[in-house]
Regions:
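Residues forming the flavin
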Residues: 2-90, 94, 127-471
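Low-complexity, intrinsically disordered basic tails/loops
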Residues: 80, 116-117
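Short, surface-exposed, low-complexity cationic segments
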Residues: 89-105
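Charged, glycine/proline-rich intrinsically disordered loops and linkers
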Residues: 103-107, 362-363
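Conserved catalytic/binding loops enriched for acidic/polar residues
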Residues: 106-116
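Flexible glycine/acidic-rich beta-alpha junction loops that bind and position SAM and/or redox cofactors
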Residues: 121
Length: 471
């Protein structure tokens, strides 16, 4: 399968763009087989990834955000929760064609994380407790989704990723980091390699496109430039909610990262909880041209608060179908209103139509874990419909979790989950361009660690099969 003689450094069997879970799991399928595999990532090695905001308390405006880029992907410094279901964070069954295959992929990926050091403990709820919570939620029109989960923790995940990376290297995989791919080399609708930022060309028999969430906009550019088959998907826009942990402890004991789905009354919009960080910390994320928020939970350090994302699903039709462009516009306005920082507002102030001030924040019973913020008015930065969905959704959730929508609850904006244009792919994740495969969040095929990793496995196996055929 590999070419005879000395392989030039510019010539590879497979080039994988992105060293997140999709890229690493694809590389795992190709390792130990005499295949020349190069993994390229714009970020740094896992040992070098570090956010200075942890010490300084403020975003250092790094040229390359270590939270978003580098080996392990953006999920490395999230709360590290692995949702072990094929229908959460994606729709694996739609890709594989059946549920048993999708579940088998989830189990396989879970086994990989265990192999490299993920905790053995699996968070599964007591059946009676789950039924009670489901009944309580259903009685007020809220849907609670039970999920088996494995929690790595934001501080433990890097060790697991490092073990994974070292194993891949020992089995022949080459990593090229701090290298940005500018374009794909495509001739006659066939991908023959990549063009790096400074003009260097690398050739390959097969290329896997999996640049992660931060690469979503770049993927959109590729779609337009090369006429690839793709469609715009939805986008999730909302806030990061922070409450005293005691309010949610009884819920997180049932499910570590509880998923609640809500339909708002006024607009019939879909709102959901996402990425709950028990005793965690709110963090700032830096994108190109705007900022966002996220949440971390550490195994070595705990706060008195629990935070979670509260997101409104937004879909667009003509004349503006580009949800990424829309989400960026909302995020840029919020960044402008916040003076370059996330906006922080008390729930009570938002309800009463008044901006929060530092004096109100300082005397608030709930103390903000992210200090690099600007107290303000979220309704000045977000569309009215989304603001009303957030208020109405939290008040409905309050009927299931009393206190979650109290006046002292803290809201950080914006929290936006960007999904790239969804590339149209085959069951093997081959794109409409010959020799080019796609996987992960950056290509619109997943929305979490497990599903991203699973799509990487699918693509890696498909590429291996083609190489074995001699394609």
């Amino acid at each position: 399968m590999s070419r005879t003689g000395t392989k030039p450094k510019t010539d590879w069997d497979v080039i994988i763009i992105g060293a997140g879970p999709a890229g690493m799991c694809a590389a795992n399928e190709l390792a130990d087989r005499g295949i020349g595999v190069l993994v390229i990532d714009r970020g740094r090695d896992i040992k070098e990834r570090h956010c200075p905001m942890e010490e300084a308390g403020k975003c250092a405006q790094c040229k390359q955000c270590d939270i978003m880029c580098g080996v392990g992907g953006a999920g490395t410094f999230s709360d590290g929760t692995l949702n072990l279901r094929p229908d959460i964070g994606g729709d694996l069954a739609a890709i594989t064609g059946d549920n048993p295959t999708a579940w088998a992929l989830v189990d396989y990926v879970d086994g990989l994380f265990l192999k490299y050091g993920a905790p053995e403990r699996l968070y599964t709820a007591d059946g009676a407790q789950v039924e009670k919570l489901k009944r309580s939620a259903a009685s007020v029109g809220v849907h609670f989704i039970e999920i088996p989960q494995r929690h790595m923790g934001s501080d433990n995940a890097p060790r697991i990723i490092e073990n994974f990376e070292n194993d891949l290297k020992s089995r022949g995989t080459v990593f090229r980091l701090n290298a940005q791919v500018r374009d794909l080399l495509i001739e006659d609708n066939t991908c023959t390699g990549v063009l790096l930022e400074h003009g260097e060309k690398l050739s390959s028999r097969f290329t896997l496109l999996c640049p992660g969430r931060i690469g979503g906009e770049w993927v959109n550019t590729l779609v337009k430039r090369h006429g690839m088959d793709a469609k715009h998907g939805a986008i999730d826009i909302g806030v990061r909610v922070e409450v005293p942990s005691i309010i949610m402890d009884h819920i997180t004991k049932i499910n570590h990262d509880p998923k609640f789905h809500i339909r708002t009354k006024r607009y019939d919009d879909f709102v959901r909880t996402f990425c709950t960080n028990e005793h965690g910390f709110v963090v700032k994320e830096r994108y190109e041209g705007f900022i966002g928020t996220n949440g971390h939970s550490l195994k070595s350090r705990r706060s008195d608060n629990t935070n979670f994302a509260f997101l409104v699903r937004t879909e667009l039709t003509e004349p503006l179908e580009d949800t990424t462009r829309y989400g960026k516009s909302v995020s840029k306005l919020a960044t402008t209103i916040g003076g370059g920082n996330p906006i922080l507002q008390r729930m009570g102030d938002l309800r009463r139509g008044q901006r929060s001030t530092w004096s109100r924040i300082r005397r608030n019973p709930v103390k903000n874990t992210l200090e690099d913020v600007t107290p303000g008015d979220i309704s000045m930065a977000m569309p009215h419909r989304i603001v009303m969905d957030i208020i109405e959704g939290l008040e409905k959730l309050n009927e299931v979790i009393p206190g979650v929508a109290s006046d002292s609850t803290l809201l950080y904006a914006p929290e936006v989950k960007f999904y790239a244009m969804e590339l149209q792919v085959s069951q093997e994740l081959a794109t409409s361009t010959k020799g080019l495969y796609a996987a992960g969040d950056g290509t619109g095929l997943s929305r979490d660690i497990i599903n991203a990793a699973a799509t990487g496995v699918i693509a890696g196996r498909a590429i291996l099969q083609q190489l074995e055929k001699g394609s």
